[in-house]
Amino acid sequence: MKKIFFILLLLICGGGINAQLYTYPEGLRTGLPHNDDFTVRVRTKGGEWKETFEYKVQVDMDRVTDASMVQFDMDEPVEVMVKKNNGMIQQVDIRPYSKNIEYKQVKNCIFFTLDKPQYLSVEFNGDRLNNLHLFANPVETETYKESSEGVMYFGPGTHRPGDLPNNQIRIPSNTTVYLAPGAVVEAKLLVDHAENVRIIGRGIIYKAIRGIEVTDSKNVYIDGITVVNPDHYSIFGGGSKGITVRNFKAFSCKGWSDGIDVMSCQDIDIENIFMRNSDDCLAFYNHRWNWWGGTNHVNVRKAVLWADIAHPINIGGHGDPESEVGETIENLTFRDIDILEQDE
């Protein structure tokens, strides 16, 4: 009887036994630039503090500025400490304000608790350029340690394509691409005339021509990836059907560096994203370039959008004026959207 009671007690009280908090120490070895504006540590409640790697990202085409980004995975409440390493703290804003994050300040540090995964901007003294982007991801449910049949694996470290002139990596049908924590891919991931492709993980696509390009394809799933400072789109879709995006983050600071742009596509499902772009964060078009026809059945929810330049959401603007039957954009739904900036 005592044994049964002990097991029941573990089941009731042992939620923290399997609690997980991952801070990606592999990020220290990628060679990507570090930003020392802030020191960020996280811990489970009452646990030991864990260091994060403060990546340097660039924002705002009008005045390109070095901002900071940290990432970690969590599946239970965590405590966060942010130390400002230059200057005094006079004002603190944690956005989106809809998250209602309360903080405590101790000298040049602030402390706050996150009860669930979410994507935030932490801003000191009204500075929205040299700010901290804090990405608390859900814990990964699927990971890989090496490449195998049907799996393209990118481990910690920097990866460049073999065909450097093209600066792209082509993904065939029926492939899972896994970017491990600490993986940095300096190339566009191209899904062209393919189907049943998944691009997942916690790695980074860094300064590619485009982040992920999906053309004339179907059933493409993207989850957890971060795209940092591409020349052009973070995700581009053309003439494709069934594109799903989850837990996606992106930064850009150049002209025409939109976030997620799709044209002549159907069945687009986007959830839990953070986009800070120097062009439209989300754009939905009809005909453009090599793709014709309408765009329909688009569902966007739980999105944080920050347009340093242009629009958080842009619908229309391109089409086929010579079409005899016309093209339509229809069945678009947007829910739970936070707009942090729009600046034309």
Task: Indicate residue ranges for each PLM-predicted region.
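Sterically constrained small-residue positions within well-ordered secondary structures
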Residues: L10, Q71-D73, T113, K145, ...
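Extracellular "leader-to-stem" segments immediately downstream of a signal peptide or signal-anchor
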Residues: G14, N18-S173, V184-A187, H193-R198, ...
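Generic structural hydrophobic/aromatic packing signal, biased to beta-strands
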Residues: V80-V82, F112, V122, L134, ...
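Right-handed parallel beta-helix
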Residues: N174-T176, P181, E195-I205, K218-N229, ...
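Well-ordered, non-transmembrane segments within structured domains
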Residues: G150-T175, P181-A183, K188, V228-G255
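Glycine-rich beta-solenoid repeat tracts in large extracellular/virion proteins
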Residues: N166-I171, V184-H193, K207-D216, Y233-G239, ...
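Sec-dependent N-terminal signal peptides
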Residues: I4-C13, N174
